[in-house]
Amino acid sequence: MKLMKVLIVGSGGREHAIAWSVAKSPKVDKIYCAPGNAGISEYAECVPIGAMEFEKLADFAGEHDVDLTIIGMDDPLVGGVVDVFEARGLKVFGPRKNAAILEGSKAFSKDLMKKYGIPTAGYENFDDPQKALEYLHTQAKFPIVLKADGLALGKGVLICNTLEEAEAGVKEIMEDKKFGSAGNTMVIEEFMTGREVSVLSFVDGKTIRTMTSAQDHKRAMDGDKGLNTGGMGTFSPSPFYTEEVDEFCKKHIYQATVDAMAAEGRPFVGIIFFGLMLTAEGPKVLEYNARFGDPEAQVVLPRMKNDIIEVMEACVNGKLDQVDLEFEDNAAVCVVLASEGYPVKYEKGIPMYGFENFKDKDGYYCFHAGTKFQDGQIVTNGGRVLGITAKGKTLKEARKNAYDATEWIQFANKYMRHDIGKAIDEA
């Protein structure tokens, strides 16, 4: 059997977790990552090509006989990187542009759910700020949610408690274009209350296999205060994702989404991330993502028993029905170490110490996000710097282990939340 060469596109903690998973596969003997980071370089040869440089990425894959390219990030998927690879006959894991719209346009995904009866919050789409304001003045119930239609680094969602806040939000998203063209269209949707749960899945266009559940912590500060971020920590599994919830979602949400995309002529191959809200009326879809979550990947992949390459190849080849996913009967918690001041303003280039503490420690992981090498020293290079993941027999044990391990790394402006997984105590 010829061993495989794999290219991973991206540079975050999610891509580090993917690289770690791929490195365990006996089918693989060479991993490249574009552009990668300091941690990924332990498993992969990092190449200085940006995630949005589609032609260069495809050239590289062709020239280096890459057998499979894995796209980690949302921007290139929504931009059509998969189509560029497929046009050259290169094997690539991820949805085409016409399917990545499931994440790329919130208005599209809301209309899809409405058309196919997939449970979600009530909403209206607007491309005219005056009409949006008129709706807010005449029909809105507060609190209400405003969402920029396009990609906005997970930050284009505003929860408005009053009409004044909502008016300011319309101005910010649609007139001041705080999120650029992502705000050309805006979704106004009813505010849902309940527990949030994330479920990741592999999809081959027809068949869907769900992974274990996880729960994210989006706000920057303890007590769910502060600004929305890309995610400050996660735990898996979610104790609130019961068998009953799973049954409901299998019946009304998961396969229904895959079938809806196929019926629209947009067969989805890759990862669908279901952001769910467990409401009093039952589970509803908050959002879809077309790739692994970050930091959800950092708690889900370490618990997966399968060879990730086998599963991804099954997706690309339309044979996912032959695969059963298996997860360890344990728990994992990830605490993000960020730069003080994230997500607004923060210093970069600060030296970090303590990585050797993770050597040969079973069940402890240090996934790199915003890191790079500078004169042989690992320094900070972003807002979210590292994801410290630990496993345990129970969620409480995993949480204690993860927080213990956060002490193993030092850097001057280290910041983290101290209440990741507090909901575990409420289960």
Where are the regions that the model predicts?
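Internal nucleotide-binding/catalytic subdomain
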Residues: V157-A297
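Short acidic-hydrophobic, aromatic-tinged amphipathic segments that line or gate anion-handling sites
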Residues: C46-M52, E124-D128, C160
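Generic C-terminus detector
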Residues: T371-D375, V379-A427
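Solvent-exposed alpha-helices and their adjacent loops that cap or buttress functional pockets
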Residues: A23-K24, G39-S41, F93, K115-G117, ...
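ATP-binding N-terminal substructure of ATP-dependent carboxylate-amine bond-forming enzymes
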Residues: M1-K97
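Active-site "cap" helix and flanking loop/linker of ATP-utilizing ligase/carboxylase catalytic domains
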Residues: K250-I272, N289-K361, Q374
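A conserved helix-loop-beta module that forms one wall/lid of the active-site cleft
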Residues: F93-G156
